[in-house]
Amino acid sequence: MEKILVLLLVALAVVYAVPDPRGIIIHLEDGELCLNSVQCKSKCCHRATGLSLARCAPKASENSECSAKTLYGVYYKCPCERGLTCEGDKSIVGSITNTNFGVCHDAGRSKK
């Protein structure tokens, strides 16, 4: 009887030790507060203005405004979805000030 009780307690401990798929620090859903894009499932931590709180947001779709890269891990415009490219101005000053914005285009479709 004791062995069954111990086995049951071990099984319960294992079940409760399994981590929740929803993250507290990483794997954040869209709309949750973030500090860096690495934390978000979408890989885009977005802020509307320099003074606003950053939140996870979906990546930019075709013909939407986008940012190619960020040095800081937080975007004013999210990068494009997979398969799209962000076409626009790219400068060193824009990289530093986080103002290199463009528009998402399908590279395969625009070449045709």
Swiss-Prot record:
Domain of life the protein comes from: Eukaryota
Expression sites (tissue/organ): Expressed by the pancreas.
Cysteine disulfide partners in this protein: C34-C45, C40-C56, C44-C78, C66-C86, C80-C104
One GO CC term on file: extracellular region
UniProt KW keywords: Digestion, Disulfide bond, Lipid degradation, Lipid metabolism, Secreted, Signal
Alphabetized PROSITE patterns for the sequence: COLIPASE_1, COLIPASE_2
Location relative to the cell: Secreted
Alphabetized CDD domains for the sequence: CLPS
Signal peptide: 1-17
One MF annotation (Gene Ontology) recorded for this entry: lipase binding
Function recorded in the entry: Colipase is a cofactor of pancreatic lipase. It allows the lipase to anchor itself to the lipid-water interface. Without colipase the enzyme is washed off by bile salts, which have an inhibitory effect on the lipase.
Complexes and interactors: Forms a 1:1 stoichiometric complex with pancreatic lipase.
Annotated protein name in UniProt: Colipase
Organism: Canis lupus familiaris (Dog)
Protein's gene: CLPS
